[in-house]
Design a protein with these regions (language model features):
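C-terminal solvent-exposed extensions
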Residues: 153-180
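Residue-level detector of short coil/turn "hinge" positions at structural boundaries
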Residues: 14, 58, 165-166
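Secondary-structure end/capping motifs
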Residues: 83-163
Length: 180
């Protein structure tokens, strides 16, 4: 959805100006690309850096940079749960904030060392390259606030993709009370 949104923002009609292959299992798109399917591919990490490292292609752009800040990861809870357990929501939010503070104040190498055990299948140099790329793209926000601008962008993308029938009011779904 984000890729097609970016194409449309740049005057490219995904339906008529190019062919997007969407019938390849998500887990093997990198292999299909390296094997000769397609001229470009959209990949998450560590696959994008893996293609580059193995000489199968180059990372030429980041959807996150070109789209604007899209809140890929959001955490949800029922209003009743938040009312009954505000201390849990606040503690969880503080934990996420500590992580953001860490990644925004430490080197790519330091971060890669800390997260390496979670990515046993990815060698250290690749992991460090990925973290460096995320740093250079400002992937990690400074805070946990889900802004109204990001919410509107997300709805624009969903609406453009045809999966959102009716827009929702920001205040009806988002609270920043635990982020302040």
């Amino acid at each position: 959805m984000v890729f097609e949104y970016i194409l449309k923002m740049n005057g490219i009609d995904p339906a008529t100006d190019l062919t997007i292959i969407q019938n390849i299992d998500f887990g093997v798109t990198a292999e299909a690309f390296v094997g000769g399917t397609g001229d470009y591919t959209v990949e998450f990490e560590p696959f994008a850096t893996g293609i580059e490292k193995d000489g199968g292609g180059y990372v030429i752009a980041s959807l996150g940079v070109d789209s604007g800040y899209v809140p890929y990861t959001c955490f949800s809870a029922l209003g009743s749960y938040m009312n009954e357990h505000p201390e849990i929501i606040e503690s969880f939010t503080r934990g996420i904030q500590k992580g953001l503070d860490y990644v925004n104040s430490h080197s790519s190498e330091e971060i890669a060392k800390i997260i390496q055990p979670q990515f046993e299948e990815t060698d250290f140099d690749t992991l460090k390259t990925i973290v460096e790329r995320y740093h250079s793209q400002d992937t990690w926000k400074a805070d946990t606030i889900f802004t109204e601008d990001a919410f509107e962008l997300l709805q624009n993308i969903l609406e453009e993709a045809g999966v959102l029938d009716k827009r929702v009011d920001y205040d009806a779904l988002v609270t920043t009370q635990f982020s302040k």
